[in-house]
A protein has these predicted regions:
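Alpha-helical solenoid repeat scaffolds
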Residues: 1-215
């Protein structure tokens, strides 16, 4: 059996994105629990997600049990598109991470951002994480989904001299508080001790959730 499936595997794999789902499912059913069937199914899902053909990927999900990070995010996109309401809660780490991650996970994050299932508080947490990490472009996009307009020019000017900004930073509005979090993050990048010394003053008079984000 082992050698028997290689020729069939290569034929399917050579133009994987063009295969109907039934071909992949058929292979997986003929060679259950085999590494090649698992790989073929996982690769197929990733290819279909890249093409935004979520419907074709859907029947193949059941045949992947040991997905890596990129495959797992691709599968999550398919589940989300089919209306699975639990998927986003399972992938909160993708939502909040600021580390580089596979394209399928970045895509899942974008999908979450436009989903009505993510609350304003969820989006605020993502925004603050991106601000702390200095991801200004992504932070601006996240902020827009909660009706907050952050200025790239302002973020750049804070980045150039965060300590100077913190001395007289306004704190009244949600956007002010976002700039504050960004400024503390940039100061911590360059001078952690000064940032630690400045954070108490920066946090004074802000809501408790903002204070937590600052610290």
């Amino acid at each position: 059996v082992v050698l028997g499936y290689y020729p069939e595997y290569w034929v399917l794999n050579s133009n994987l994105a063009l295969q109907p789902a039934a071909n992949i499912v058929g292979f997986a059913q003929r060679y259950p629990q085999s590494a090649m069937a698992e790989k073929l199914a996982a690769d197929y899902i990733e290819e279909k997600v890249k093409m935004a053909d979520f419907a074709s990927a859907q029947p193949v999900l059941a045949y992947v049990s040991n997905a890596d990070r990129a495959e797992s995010c691709a599968m999550a996109q398919v589940r989300a598109k089919s209306g699975d309401p639990l998927v986003f809660a399972e992938y909160k780490d993708v939502w909040l991470t600021t580390n580089s991650q596979p394209e399928s996970c970045t895509g899942l994050g974008r999908m979450m951002l436009s989903s009505p299932l993510m609350t304003e508080q969820d989006k605020q947490q993502r925004l603050w994480a991106q601000l702390r990490a200095g991801q200004s472009g992504q932070a601006i996009a996240t902020a827009q989904t909660i009706g907050m307009n952050l200025s790239l020019a302002q973020l750049n000017s804070i980045q150039a001299d965060p300590l100077n900004y913190l001395w007289s930073a306004p704190k009244a509005s949600a956007a002010d508080q976002a700039y504050l979090i960004y400024a503390i993050g940039r100061l911590a990048d360059s001078d952690l001790n000064t940032a630690l010394a400045s954070v108490k003053r920066a946090a004074e008079g802000t809501p408790e959730s903002v204070q937590k984000a600052l610290y």
